[in-house]
A protein has these predicted regions:
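C-terminal motif of bacterial Sec signal peptides marking the signal peptidase cleavage site
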Residues: 15-18
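Bacterial signal peptide processing site
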Residues: 20-23
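Residue signature of alpha-solenoid helical repeat architecture, marking inter-repeat boundaries
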Residues: 25-29, 67
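Structural register within alpha-helical repeat arrays
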Residues: 75-76
Length: 119
């Protein structure tokens, strides 16, 4: 009987630890890395398909209460710029600046290029 009790505690402890969840990531990376990789490889995936994948990723992340990673909105803005959607481009760049203030100089630079303010 005395051997049974410690064994039971050990087994129940192992079962409970097996049910524990792993650490949560800071950002929802979902499809973002794959989309960027395809874009950099010059994959035949169209810009619209990349935008759709990133927008879906953003919706899923917000539904789960997770944040998208740094560069997400900047990349989405650059995809919008390729389609000539200036309002969406600016909105994404501003969102990137707001969420990640350290990106402000680069986002300002990209917005100034769009306006033709750089030489």
């Amino acid at each position: 009987m005395t051997l049974f009790r410690p064994s039971l505690l050990l087994v129940s402890g192992l079962l409970l630890s097996a049910c524990a969840q792993g650490p949560q990531t800071l950002y929802n990376w979902d499809q973002y890395q794959g989309v960027v990789y395809q874009h950099m490889q010059g994959d035949d995936t169209g810009v619209e398909a990349q935008i759709d994948a990133l927008e879906k990723n953003q919706q899923e992340a917000s539904a789960k209460g997770q944040a998208v990673p740094p560069g997400f909105h900047a990349h989405l803005g650059m995809l919008y710029a390729q389609l000539g959607k200036d309002a969406q481009t600016r909105e994404q760049f501003e969102t990137e600046k707001r969420l990640f203030p350290e990106s402000a100089p680069f986002m300002n630079f990209l917005m100034s290029i769009k306006k033709g303010e750089t030489q």
